[in-house]
A protein has these predicted regions:
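A short, well-structured alpha-helix characteristic of acyl/acetyltransferase catalytic modules
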Residues: 1, 12-24
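Conserved N-terminal entry element of GNAT/NAT acetyltransferase domains
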Residues: 1-12, 147-156
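Conserved beta-strand in the GNAT
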Residues: 49, 55-64, 70-77
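Conserved acetyl-CoA-binding loop-helix of GNAT-fold acetyltransferases
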Residues: 78, 84-97
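Conserved GNAT acetyl-CoA-binding A-motif
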Residues: 99-112
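C-terminal "cap" of GNAT-fold acetyltransferases
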Residues: 113, 132-156
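Conserved acetyl-CoA-binding loop of GNAT-fold acetyltransferases
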Residues: 120-129
């Protein structure tokens, strides 16, 4: 079995590896516009890189939204050769750990509807109507990260 390691991006070279994975998956494979994929928000995000036997095979980015209370998981991408090896699951688990450590109350993401079930198995719940982004159907999903305090905070 190939070893999978999740690391936080700490260098420009690692960020380039992450961006190359995103371009391969979203732009080349799925036909997403490059302008939408490279949206100018990478500088405000933390990035994770999945290494399979030291080779970059997956990535995601994590941004704080809603006044920092919510961690938004974005740009989850795994190269085709590494799919089915739990790379995506490991990336999301690492992102949730970072979000909890940073004090986020919830995590959210916009899932392509073809992978909604994957995120559901990780505890995310869909909310709101389905929407189209760059010709691809998406659904917003959310996962509470802290115990409910009894106050209505609109997070779940």
């Amino acid at each position: 079995m190939k070893e999978i390691e999740i690391v936080e991006v700490r260098s420009g070279a690692q960020l380039e590896q992450a961006l190359a994975i995103r371009l391969a998956v979203f732009v080349e494979e799925q036909g997403v516009s490059r302008a939408l994929e490279i949206d100018g928000r990478d500088g405000e995000a933390r990035h994770l890189l999945a290494l399979q036997d030291a080779v970059p095979v997956g990535t995601l980015r994590l941004r704080r939204v809603e006044d920092g209370r919510v961690a938004k998981i974005e740009r989850v991408a795994v190269l085709p050769a590494a799919r089915g090896a739990k790379v995506g699951r490991r990336l999301v688990a690492a992102a949730l750990s970072l979000a909890r450590a940073a004090g986020a109350e919830a995590a959210m993401l916009h899932a392509q509807t073809t992978v909604q079930e994957f995120y559901g198995r990780l505890g995310f719940v869909a909310f709101g109507p389905e929407f189209i982004e760059d010709s691809i159907p998406h659904i917003a999903m959310r996962l509470p990260l802290r115990e409910h305090t009894g106050q209505r905070d609109g997070l779940a």
